[in-house]
Amino acid sequence: MSALFLGFGLPSNLFGSAPADRPITAEASQIRIFDGETLGLGDRIIRLSGIAAPARGEACGSDAARADCGAAAAAGLAALLQGQDVSCRIEGYDGFRRGLGRCIAGGRDINASMVEQGFALASISVLRPLEVAARDGRHGLWADASLMPAEWRRR
């Protein structure tokens, strides 16, 4: 009898849980940028895993030269995704129940690219060499070290 039941089989996502290895994808027109590490793919909110970018409105620099480093990081992410479809594999969830994902656009690893271009810090060891190269090359937010958010300067 169990063979008969198994023969009919129920879809594994019957109750809304997609298989863990299925990526979440969105066409370019369905992508929203919230900040330098968070994007919307259709109705899903994804935080890029393994990186930390300044939040929108996070001021950096001296009193004489204030800048919105969060807006710069968001603009960096928008430039990477410009006109491209995105696919993300969810690796877990954060405290806000956002999916933590590794994302690809145009064959490019977006998480690594944000670090490589100097718009995010590496929070996993495999990306640290990219962070060092961005800092040494003064890319992105590293271009003017006096403008870095305080927590970045402590690293």
Regions found by a protein language model. Give the residues of each.
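Small beta-barrel nucleic-acid-binding modules, primarily SNase/OB-fold domains
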Residues: 1-155
